[in-house]
């Protein structure tokens, strides 16, 4: 392992939940306004993950007042306070960019079923 990899491993967050495209997540983001800071929650569907390691980022899409809003977050950024997985989605693609064209009920994602006790 070289020095760059060692420095990157030190800066990576350890408490990141496992999530994939299609999952509905809540992202708690720190927002600094002047000398005050607050946490804002952005809830939506993960439509893609990009890169890997310290540079990894993910894109979340939600519908707000009938308008689609997408926001990209660096996974290991200090401004991302927490990530909560709300539901697991069952999809067959790594990038869900086709959701941008769909409206209403057509943009729903099938939920994964889990069998308890196995």
Curated annotation (Swiss-Prot):
One GO molecular-function entry: structural constituent of ribosome
Keywords associated with the record: Ribonucleoprotein, Ribosomal protein
GO biological process terms held by the UniProt record: translation
GO cellular component terms, A-Z: cytosolic large ribosomal subunit
Pfam annotation, one family: Ribosomal_L19
Keyword Coiled coil appears in the UniProt entry: no
Domain of life: Bacteria
Record-stated family: Belongs to the bacterial ribosomal protein bL19 family.
Function according to Swiss-Prot or TrEMBL: This protein is located at the 30S-50S ribosomal subunit interface and may play a role in the structure and function of the aminoacyl-tRNA binding site.
Protein name: Large ribosomal subunit protein bL19
Lineage: Bacteria, Pseudomonadati, Thermodesulfobacteriota, Desulfuromonadia, Geobacterales
